[in-house]
């Protein structure tokens, strides 16, 4: 055990030690150590997770005869239920795509898709700032990969040109809204690049965009009218949609390849039908949350201006607002100060973000008021 203790001590010395907090949730507030704080770190972007009216409407439709609380098996064995197919058909129909496939989480999706769709003769080109789950999926793919500079499409084009004809297929991998900086990929440029090179596919993770952007809440791809041009459009139900699980929209051939070759799908017990039914209930109503999306954008624009005024650094264009302080100690101290003021703010440190860019990742939700955000900004 000595070697493990030394590792933990080293993390502590670098201000990188992590622990799981004891929390009590009360709507948009969190209580920790008897201190009630406004939650400024949630991914519940539309504020649906604590909406009691939604929850009541969902439960009432069953009259006590609820869907099963467990699937007890992989979908490929005995764990498939009609609600799974219903949700996949609804997702595909809303995106106006041929197929959709469900996964247990966004991590499961990103871990398994690339290994299932690549060979040792394939190439993956990923944005430098893609999520850790995508990096893990790339590593498991056992094929060549390069990471292009963040949102640097000239660099990506150079990599594509250098590798023309060398690989059986190429995947360009990006997030649409990046989880730490809150900035947005230029999907139009990525689609144009993809079309210039043979056997090249575009894989976009919309985890932080689904529900929040687009006329119907379908993400940045919908906002930019590019849904049909993206080969794999992945998103999660665990953030703005207040549920659990994830999806990919794609063509039928890719769906069948994933069903046959994606290990996290094949070898995992499927999500409980009860949870999938709740996801269906929320996803069906996604176009109705336009007021929440509009209000969230107003809150976000205000806080982005306030933080930029103080730091002169603001990469974000979304409701993820990074308050970049640089060093670990300063970031930890600021987070503790804001918590004492009644705001649950969390420090983000390396290796989650690059060295020297430690920050407080501020995350706004549509159930906050402008007065609450103004009062918070005054504490910065």
Curated annotation (Swiss-Prot):
Assigned keywords, A-Z: Biotin biosynthesis, Pyridoxal phosphate, Transferase
Upper taxonomic lineage: Bacteria, Pseudomonadati, Pseudomonadota, Betaproteobacteria, Neisseriales
Top-level taxon: Bacteria
Gene: bioF
Cofactors required: pyridoxal 5'-phosphate
Protein name listed in UniProt: Putative 8-amino-7-oxononanoate synthase
Subunit record text: Homodimer.
Organism expressing this protein natively: Neisseria meningitidis serogroup A / serotype 4A (strain DSM 15465 / Z2491)
Annotated GO biological process: biotin biosynthetic process
Binding site for pyridoxal 5'-phosphate: 106-107, 179, 205-208, 236-239
């Amino acid at each position: 055990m000595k070697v493990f203790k030394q590792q933990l001590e080293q993390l502590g010395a670098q201000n990188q030690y992590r622990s799981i907090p004891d929390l009590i949730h009360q709507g948009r507030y969190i209580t920790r150590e008897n201190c009630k704080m406004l939650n400024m770190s949630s991914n519940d972007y539309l504020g649906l997770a604590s909406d009691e009216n939604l929850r009541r409407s969902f439960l009432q439709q069953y009259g006590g005869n609820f869907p099963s609380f467990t699937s007890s098996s992989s979908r490929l064995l005995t764990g498939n239920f009609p609600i799974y197919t219903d949700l996949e058909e609804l997702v595909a129909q809303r995106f106006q795509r041929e197929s959709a496939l469900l996964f247990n989480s966004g991590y499961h999706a990103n871990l398994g898709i690339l290994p299932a769709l690549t060979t040792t003769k394939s190439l993956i080109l990923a944005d430098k700032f893609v999520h850790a789950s995508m990096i893990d999926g790339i590593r498991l793919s056992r094929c060549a990969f390069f990471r292009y500079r963040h949102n640097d499409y000239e660099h990506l084009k150079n990599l594509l040109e250098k590798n023309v004809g060398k690989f059986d297929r190429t995947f360009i991998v990006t997030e649409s809204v990046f989880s730490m900086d809150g900035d947005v990929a230029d999907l139009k440029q990525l689609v144009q690049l993809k079309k210039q090179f043979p056997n090249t596919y575009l894989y976009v993770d919309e985890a932080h965009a689904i529900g929040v952007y687009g006329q119907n809440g379908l993400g940045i791809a919908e906002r930019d009218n590019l849904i049909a041009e993206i080969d794999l459009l992945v998103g999660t139900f665990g953030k703005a949609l207040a549920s659990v699980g994830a999806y990919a929209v794609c063509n039928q051939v890719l769906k069948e390849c994933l069903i046959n070759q994606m290990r996290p799908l094949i070898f995992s017990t499927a999500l409980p039908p009860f949870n999938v039914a709740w996801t269906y209930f929320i996803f069906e109503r996604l176009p109705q949350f336009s007021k929440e999306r509009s209000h969230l954008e107003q809150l976000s624009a205000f806080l982005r201006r306030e933080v930029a005024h103080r730091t002169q650094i603001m990469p974000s264009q979304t409701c993820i607002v990074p308050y970049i302080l640089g060093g670990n100690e300063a970031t930890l101290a600021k987070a503790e100060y804001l918590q004492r003021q009644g705001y649950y703010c969390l420090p983000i440190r390396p290796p989650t973000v690059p060295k020297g860019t430690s920050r407080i990742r501020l995350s706004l939700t549509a159930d906050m008021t402008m007065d609450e955000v103004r009062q918070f900004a005054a504490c910065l």
